Amino acid sequence: MGCRLSFAVTEPARFATQIAPATTAGVVSDERLGITLNGAPVGDVTEHRGAHGARIHLFACGPGELTVDCATVLGAAPIGRSIGPRNGGDEPDDTVEALVALRQSRYCESDRLVGFAATEFPGAQGDDPYTTAVRVSSWVFERLAYASGASDHLDSAVDTLLTGAGVCRDYAHLTIALCRALGIPARLASVYAPGLFPMDFHAVTEVLVAGVWLALDSTRLAPRAELVRIATGRDAADSAFATVLEGRAELLEVEVFASSDRDLAVDDHVSPVSLA
């Protein structure tokens, strides 16, 4: 799995990318990260650790044609889909993380959807949180039309609700915002998704239930058991695959590939699934 990003850099720029699988995703058997400007390697690329094993690469370059290539092969062992405790170590405290995942954020204005959510999902407060989250995810799946180009990087959950169309991040943002409005901690995970068509970076929702983060894909375009975590955050603002920190650059092309050497799992999009 991996990707190739192409940029036209028009003035000296600094970049941050989140394209390598998270350290929690599994054992890496082979990996390549190549960053070139006009065909020559870019030096001084540093890797930094983000939340939940995210790997952030920082680098700078001058004007020219920039290409970022990343390819990773994970070991054949299952990548931890069972329901169980979250990986320990330096992860955020459960209570603090739950509080953050309940608050409105840039693309998930849950505070504006409290009344709507209460009306659309009556009785949700008394239901099991995961059952409610599945109801929300199914509602988003039925309500929205998946349409490339129907939204842009400025569109939020409320915009998506009004337009009724979007792509994976829009589905995730609306699902997250509605879950938060119903009192369920929710966050976004960017992932590689074997089986996804058309192939691209993918975004799904995670909800916190009884101390475990469970994944929901409101697009239903890929089996959750095959997803490989890249980054995790409040919304797409925390999980962007590339950010221009300084300078000026235009993204020209994105190519993503992800496959598995085994038969893809069948997903009913109801049973609980936890990402590694």
Annotate each language-model stretch with its function:
Residues 17, 35, 61, 76, ...:
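Generic structural "secondary-structure junction" signal
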Residues 51-54, 97, 156, 211, ...:
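Residue-level signal for pocket-adjacent positions within structured domains
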Residues 9, 68, 74-78, 84, ...:
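Secondary-structure boundary elements
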Residues 20-22, 84-95, 219-223, 245-246:
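Short intrinsically disordered coil segments
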Residues 1-83, 87:
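Intrinsically disordered, low-complexity N-terminal segments that are enriched in acidic
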Residues 39-45, 52-57, 70, 105-113, ...:
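Low-complexity, flexible helical/coil segments
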Residues 6, 123, 138, 170-248:
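Hydrophobic/aromatic-rich core segments of domains that either
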Residues 29-32, 41-43, 59-61, 93-97, ...:
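Glycine-rich loops and low-complexity Gly/Arg-rich segments
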